A protein has these predicted regions:
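Conserved CoA-thioester-binding segment of acyl-CoA-metabolizing enzymes
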Residues: 1-53, 87
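C-terminal alpha-helix plus adjacent terminal tail
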Residues: 1-11, 161-167, 182, 186, ...
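Acidic-histidine catalytic/liganding microenvironments
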Residues: 7, 42, 92-93, 235
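Hydrophobic/aromatic residues within transmembrane alpha-helices
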Residues: 13, 50, 62, 111-113, ...
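A general structural signal for well-ordered alpha-helical segments in protein cores
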Residues: 29, 63, 82, 142, ...
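Hydrophobic helix-cap positions at the C-terminus of alpha-helices
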Residues: 35, 39, 89-92, 195, ...
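Glycine- (often His-adjacent) and acidic-residue-rich active-site loop
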Residues: 52-88, 104, 132, 217, ...
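Crotonase-fold acyl-CoA enzyme core
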Residues: 87-201
Length: 253
């Protein structure tokens, strides 16, 4: 589900549901949130890297579980869940680096808004498929994306549900560096080790002063998005999209 490894004060969290393209189900939300909480409190961890196993970074929310949750909301409920994971990401006090090794969809793309540095494989792609699923944005992306990439780029990403290439993500400022696939993790960890060599209290002070002013705005954006999401989830467009996804998945098995 989630692999955790340490090297030179750098903790790497590897999303490990490769058969599901590392889609987030309740168990993975829980594992990721708990791993971040543990890393935040560990005096031997200076930097956290998040990456994915296999050919995907993360395919986003597990749509099969999402459809099941519409009819039975408590069936797959976890300890932390999606929103608690967002709280933990927003409050994470140490440098957080994402290494996008493959496709990143939904939260697999919007999680980059919480990264202090993002590296991306040259053959990876990103997508925010909210309009194709008939739902609203998530993870404060309606606030964080315009800050990262500008209003018009953010509008295109969030409204079009189109793929964004690594080159486009770099040009927009959504990621910091694009690497060859075979060099992604090495390059990510090389930079992570530079940060990890610095005093942890100083790293945390830099991050706090940069991110503390954003926390209330992130919380407000999530509240707005959640209200819109609640209106749209299970509505005609969303139900049709989820049904099509489930039918397609079953026909491919």
């Amino acid at each position: 589900m989630l692999n955790v490894s340490d090297d030179n004060r750098v903790r790497t969290l590897t999303l490990n549901r490769p058969a599901a393209l590392n889609a987030f189900n309740e168990a993975l939300y829980d594992s990721t949130a708990q791993a971040l909480l543990t890393a935040a409190d560990d005096p031997d961890v200076a930097v956290v890297v998040i990456t994915g196993a296999g050919r995907a970074f993360s395919a986003g929310a597990d749509l099969v579980e999402m459809q099941a949750n519409i009819t039975n909301p408590r069936e797959n409920a976890g300890q932390h869940g999606f929103f608690r994971m967002l709280d933990v990401l927003s409050a994470f006090p140490k440098p957080l680096i994402c290494a996008v090794n493959g496709v990143g969809v939904g939260i697999g793309a919007t999680i980059l808004g919480y990264a202090d540095l993002a590296f991306m494989s040259s053959d990876a792609r990103l997508k925010c498929p909210f309009t194709s699923l008939g739902v609203a944005p998530e993870a404060a992306s309606s606030f964080l994306l315009p800050r990262q990439v500008g209003r018009q780029n953010a509008a295109w990403i969030l409204m079009s549900s189109e793929w964004i290439t690594a080159a486009e993500a770099l040009e927009m400022g959504l990621v910091w560096k694009v690497c060859e696939p075979t060099e992604l993790l090495a390059e990510t960890k090389r930079h992570a080790n530079v940060l990890a060599s610095k005093p942890i209290p100083s790293l945390m002070a830099v991050k706090t002063t940069m991110t503390a002013p954003l926390r209330p705005q992130i919380d407000a954006a999530i509240e707005r998005e959640t209200a819109c999401f609640a209106e749209l989830i299970g509505a005609a467009a969303n139900a049709a999209a989820l049904s099509e996804f489930t039918s397609r998945g079953q026909s491919e098995e």
